[in-house]
Amino acid sequence: MWIGVISLFPEMFRAITEHGVTGRAVKSGLLQIECWNPREFTHDKHRTVDDRPYGGGPGMLMMVQPLRDAIHAAKQAAGDGAKVIYLSPQGRKLTQAGVTELATNQKLILVAGRYEGIDERVIQTEVDEEWSIGDYVLSGGELPAMTLIDAVSRLVPGVLGDQASAEQDSFTDGLLDHPHYTRPELLDGLAVPEALTSGNHEVIRRWRLKQSLGRTWQRRPELINNLALTDEQESLLAEYVREVRDSVK
């Protein structure tokens, strides 16, 4: 997978190109990340990349010419088929379903804004989609871009050593992940659930599914409401709910 990034702070992306799962993917050639800095496309001695907004008001916008030139350079490097994404609070909220959708693209160009944002006409003429990672304000689009890269790259075949890791992650099936345990078997008086030490794969599978359903019901009930549960899932969830209610009587 090829990902181009437009950013005034390309050095920030070393965090994902040199470390962790994404760093290994880059080193193995499964993931290629290239950055373009609009500052490199300026024509004045001060290398200006911000400009005043029409209508006044606080803050500045990214200057149109350097930004557009950087996007054009990334598009030329990408060739045909690259989808341009602007990381924006006004965009579609990123979910695991959205990550799966984005992962079907072989080429992405991510535009990380700064200041108060970018000219609306640049969005209209250069951007294919806007995406947001949540309803809060950040100083720029770099962290959202890195979040998107990390999430999408996990779905690229071969990036994870065990593809089951991606398939069993939280949200992959619309549910939160089940609890995890490792050694020691007893920690400060708290034991690993018997189901996980039983050695019975079916018992373990059902326990994990029940915990996943129950945790989603308790912490993100809106996710449960949006799912069409199977008979087994409904039965396990009902069992979990009874256990919780019995424990507080």
Curated annotation (Swiss-Prot):
Main location: cytoplasm
TM ranges: none
Signal peptide segment: none
Molecular function GO terms recorded: tRNA (guanine(37)-N1)-methyltransferase activity
Family indicated by similarity: Belongs to the RNA methyltransferase TrmD family.
Subunit architecture: Homodimer.
Protein name per Swiss-Prot or TrEMBL: tRNA (guanine-N(1)-)-methyltransferase
High-level lineage: Bacteria, Pseudomonadati, Pseudomonadota, Gammaproteobacteria, Aeromonadales
